[in-house]
Amino acid sequence: MNILSLSECVDRLRKNLVIAYPTESVLGLGCNPESIDAVKVLLKLKKRKLNKGFILVASHFNQIRSYISESKLSIYHKKILYSSWPDTITYLLPAKSFVPDWLTGRSNFLGIRISAHNGINKLCSAFGKAIISTSANISGRNPCRTYEEFLKQFGTTVPILCGPLGTRKNPSKILNIINGSLIRHG
C-alpha cells in the first residue's frame, strides 16, 4: 500500500494528482476540483463518464463560497445549511455560472458537504480549499470500505492518507436545497 502523510497528500493535491482518503463511511478518491487534468485521471481510475458531476467536501463554508451562488439562497436556505453542517449531508446548491461542467454535471447545481470527519477537515484545512470527493470504487462496483478492498480495486497506483473511517454505513444523503427533493438516501 502506498501510504502518505497529510503533508504529502496536500502536496499531491497541489500538483493536481489524485489521492485516496477515509470519509464518513467509505474510502474516497479526491483531487483539486479546479484541475481538469486531475479530474480526467480520477475519471479514468473510476472508469466513469464526465457528465455525472462531483461532490466537493470542505472543512468550512468559506472554502466553498467561490463555487456557489449565495444570492440564490434565501435566509431560510442559509439557516438550514448553517444548522445542519458540519455533517454527512450533501446539499445541491446553486452553482456560479463559471463553475466548470465537470463539477456540476452540466446542471446549475453543485454537490457540497461541509464534513464533520476529522480526517477530511484536516486535509481540506491543510490544502486551503475544498476537494472533490467521490467514493473509491470502479464504476459499477461497491465502494471500498477497507484498505484491503481498495488494494483489490486499485492496487498501489493511488496513494492513501490512512486514518479511521467514520461510523456511517451509507454514503451521504443528498438533498436539493432549493426544492427539498431527496436525491440519494444516506
From Swiss-Prot:
<dbReference type="InterPro" id="IPR023535">
    <property type="entry name" value="TC-AMP_synthase"/>
</dbReference>
<keyword id="KW-0547">Nucleotide-binding</keyword>
<dbReference type="InterPro" id="IPR006070">
    <property type="entry name" value="Sua5-like_dom"/>
</dbReference>
<dbReference type="GO" id="GO:0006450">
    <property type="term" value="P:regulation of translational fidelity"/>
</dbReference>
<keyword id="KW-0067">ATP-binding</keyword>
<comment type="similarity">
    <text>Belongs to the SUA5 family. TsaC subfamily.</text>
</comment>
<keyword id="KW-0548">Nucleotidyltransferase</keyword>
<keyword id="KW-0819">tRNA processing</keyword>
<feature type="domain" description="YrdC-like">
    <location>
        <begin position="3"/>
        <end position="186"/>
    </location>
</feature>
<dbReference type="GO" id="GO:0005737">
    <property type="term" value="C:cytoplasm"/>
</dbReference>
<comment type="function">
    <text>Required for the formation of a threonylcarbamoyl group on adenosine at position 37 (t(6)A37) in tRNAs that read codons beginning with adenine. Catalyzes the conversion of L-threonine, HCO(3)(-)/CO(2) and ATP to give threonylcarbamoyl-AMP (TC-AMP) as the acyladenylate intermediate, with the release of diphosphate.</text>
</comment>
<keyword id="KW-0963">Cytoplasm</keyword>
<protein>
    <recommendedName>
        <fullName>Threonylcarbamoyl-AMP synthase</fullName>
        <ecNumber>2.7.7.87</ecNumber>
    </recommendedName>
</protein>
<dbReference type="GO" id="GO:0003725">
    <property type="term" value="F:double-stranded RNA binding"/>
</dbReference>
<dbReference type="Pfam" id="PF01300">
    <property type="entry name" value="Sua5_yciO_yrdC"/>
</dbReference>
<dbReference type="GO" id="GO:0000049">
    <property type="term" value="F:tRNA binding"/>
</dbReference>
<dbReference type="GO" id="GO:0002949">
    <property type="term" value="P:tRNA threonylcarbamoyladenosine modification"/>
</dbReference>
<keyword id="KW-0808">Transferase</keyword>
<dbReference type="GO" id="GO:0061710">
    <property type="term" value="F:L-threonylcarbamoyladenylate synthase"/>
</dbReference>
<dbReference type="InterPro" id="IPR017945">
    <property type="entry name" value="DHBP_synth_RibB-like_a/b_dom"/>
</dbReference>
<dbReference type="InterPro" id="IPR050156">
    <property type="entry name" value="TC-AMP_synthase_SUA5"/>
</dbReference>
<dbReference type="GO" id="GO:0005524">
    <property type="term" value="F:ATP binding"/>
</dbReference>
